């Protein structure tokens, strides 16, 4: 596991312990069972792809460990509406505070402002976080294979599926891909960013795509800035894209989203 992931896991487990002390698991699970109705994250993507269109998971992200502050003018509801107007299929909202200046409240506010399904983008280490995500309205969670062993990944996936949620499995290399393919979820994100070095190359997606079975929906993640990047990934069968930084840096987010999708189509 990389140094950055080790650091993140340490503070995440402290966060989880504090959250459990404040809100016991039974309480959060009850809230999850009575959360707002699911919107169907994977279904929204499948429907878009069925119409022969690219599917965009548009990300609301204030900052990152590698780039620092990305957007000072940060208004999650306004950004969510801008993405929806620009043609996004789903939203991804960073909820990690120490590394990304995110918050669960940002996800709640973004989801309330649109009709789009929402991914809680965070580092998941405990099924408690799954309950917490659903209790706050999330339709999908992220599992980073580099951060978890197989048993933990399986338990977290099962908790999400039991609640009717979707799961995006994220991989960066062949061993992680092989592990992810043993799980049930069909959404498979290929992260072009190396979480150890922060180097980003679309060649990662190009190298792994051929090993992904046809029943999986590949999602290109990181390093996607232009229609040419989308076209490059589309050539290896990737038609769903998670894009954050390049759109977050634009003054007119709706126009930038629309342009990215229009020129890529």
UniProtKB/Swiss-Prot annotation:
Enzyme class, first EC level, given as a word: lyase
Catalytic activity: 1-(2-carboxyphenylamino)-1-deoxy-D-ribulose 5-phosphate + H(+) = (1S,2R)-1-C-(indol-3-yl)glycerol 3-phosphate + CO2 + H2O
InterPro entries tied to this protein: Aldolase_TIM, Indole-3-glycerol_P_synth, Indole-3-glycerol_P_synth_dom, Indole-3-GlycerolPSynthase_CS, RibuloseP-bd_barrel
GO molecular function list: indole-3-glycerol-phosphate synthase activity; phosphoribosylanthranilate isomerase activity
Keyword entries, A-Z: Amino-acid biosynthesis, Aromatic amino acid biosynthesis, Decarboxylase, Lyase, Tryptophan biosynthesis
EC assignment: 4.1.1.48
Pfam families: IGPS (PF00218)
Pathway: Amino-acid biosynthesis; L-tryptophan biosynthesis; L-tryptophan from chorismate: step 4/5
A GO biological-process term: L-tryptophan biosynthetic process
HAMAP family documented for this protein: IGPS_B
Family: Belongs to the TrpC family.
Protein name, entry field: Indole-3-glycerol phosphate synthase
Organism: Afipia carboxidovorans (strain ATCC 49405 / DSM 1227 / KCTC 32145 / OM5) (Oligotropha carboxidovorans)
